[in-house]
Amino acid sequence: LHDALPILTVAEQFYSSNGVPISEDKGDFWSKNYPNRYDFTIIPDEGNNKHYLKIGEETAYLHLNREPRFYANLSFDRGTWYGYGYASDEPKDLAFYKFRAKEVSGRITSEDYSYTGYLNKKVCSYKTSVTDNGLSTERYAFPIIRLADLYLMYAEALNETLNTPSNDVYTYIDLVRERAGLDGVKESWQKYSKYPEKPNTKTGMREIIRMERLNELACEGKRFWDLRRWKKELPREVKGWYVQGETAQEFYRVTTLYLRSRYSFKDYLWPLKVETVLKDPNLGQNPGW
């Protein structure tokens, strides 16, 4: 369980409900609340909140006004979970999760709890159900590769070959965004971002494409390889909520779980087998090994 948990960084990188990074969103909500995104508030009965969160409960500002993929992929404190025996859109029929210590989805006595305060929804079938009588599971084929991944790879490759993004770059990114219920890249950045010109440059689109890959392919095992080919994986702090906390005041404290300090440049390429190197002395070993 603990090796497959979303961390706080992933929760932050999903877009706002306007389809841009929450740090860039110039709308009223995120302009006001981004600096205090780790604080908690009472969930208001407005917009689509009733489908995503438990109205009247307390959760972090970070969990409000986010894009549909945030709610589809992540389970979090006071968030709803469609399925698991609940197949109605009515708020009264939706399951919602309590992650604080001594609560049903939090740490009680065993080690079966989330260290970060988040769980994956994507890898769980909505037909799986948990009742007082036991657990009923539904298996399904895990996606090895899917059309959205192909669109994103094509857009990325095309962007890297051009001085400025072409219409095709936007077209294939927008196909993925449309399925997620978001406006196109140029429209979203023009209307909602503090940096409306970002999609117009190669560097800006590179950043956007990489964010789209994270948001669309979250929990599918792609990030491991993406970070390595982009040379973006370096030692960093892994953070989550303070899951030992029993109250909202205690729980919503950003906590460093551990520091990944052993990763170095040589880890971008794994070592070749000795037998492979011995077959051809001119081949040599990968750097650092």
What spans do the regions from the language model cover?
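Acidic/polar-rich alpha-helix caps and helix-coil junctions
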Residues: 1-289
